């Protein structure tokens, strides 16, 4: 996936994966893993990378990643 996506496209991608289980407005760690493996495969170099990335993105510590938290990752990789 190209990092150059419109905000609407990014929101659609986020919602597609977030709706798989639990809260449709939040990504669980498994949903984030699936999204990254599919859309940004070069970001995941191993299991520790996912854990570190999830911890970094989950700013409020609720165990899930909101769209706002996800946007931090998108901004970081599009620079």
Swiss-Prot record:
Modified residues (Phosphoserine): 42
Gene source species: Bos taurus
Chain residues that bind Ca(2+) 1: 26, 31
Post-translational modification N-acetylserine, affected residues: 2
GO molecular function, one term: calcium ion binding
PROSITE patterns named among the record's database cross-references: EF_HAND_1, EF_HAND_2, S100_CABP
Ranges for domain EF-hand: 13-48, 45-79
Binding site for Ca(2+) 2: 58, 60, 62, 64, 69
Xref: InterPro entries: EF-hand-dom_pair (IPR011992), EF_Hand_1_Ca_BS (IPR018247), EF_hand_dom (IPR002048), S100/CaBP7/8-like_CS (IPR001751), S100_Ca-bd_sub (IPR013787)
GO cellular component, one term: basolateral plasma membrane
Name under which the protein is recorded: Protein S100-G
């Amino acid at each position: 996936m190209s990092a150059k996506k419109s905000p609407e496209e990014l929101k659609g991608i986020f919602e597609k994966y977030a709706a798989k289980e639990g809260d449709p407005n939040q990504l669980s760690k498994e949903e984030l893993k699936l999204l990254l493996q599919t859309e940004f495969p070069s970001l995941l170099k191993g299991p520790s990378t996912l854990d570190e990335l999830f911890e970094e993105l989950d700013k409020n510590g609720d165990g899930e990643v909101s769209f706002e938290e996800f946007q931090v990752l998108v901004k970081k990789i599009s620079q």
